[in-house]
């Protein structure tokens, strides 16, 4: 079995309040080590909230996003194992947009013959 490490970036932009939307979902032979979840509120007047869950457990719960600002949601690496789902929910007025940026390491186990 070979192990392949890939350093990746994933970005998502939303302009509406949404609930339990999948962000990242590693396959069963993958493990994601998330280094950064950076969220940007592009509104000059609205302060929506965001929650992040990892397999139904809150990583961040109802984080208020300041106007025209970015915030780092995690301070330590976060492990997302294969077969689980990292999701987000937004609430409030999100019409100007909220960007979610994730930097992570994908550890992929490949079977070689």
Label every PLM stretch briefly:
Residues 43-63:
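Short, surface-exposed beta-strand/strand-loop-strand elements in extracellular ectodomains
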Residues 70-77:
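Exposed aromatic-hydrophobic patches
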Residues 64-70:
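Short proline/glycine- and polar residue-rich coil/turn motifs
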Residues 30, 69, 82-84, 98:
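Surface-exposed loop/turn positions
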Residues 77-96:
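Noncatalytic modules at the cell exterior or secretory-pathway interfaces
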Residues 1-32, 36, 40, 90-113:
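C-terminal interaction-tip segments
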Residues 16-17, 55, 66:
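Serine/threonine-rich, low-complexity intrinsically disordered segments
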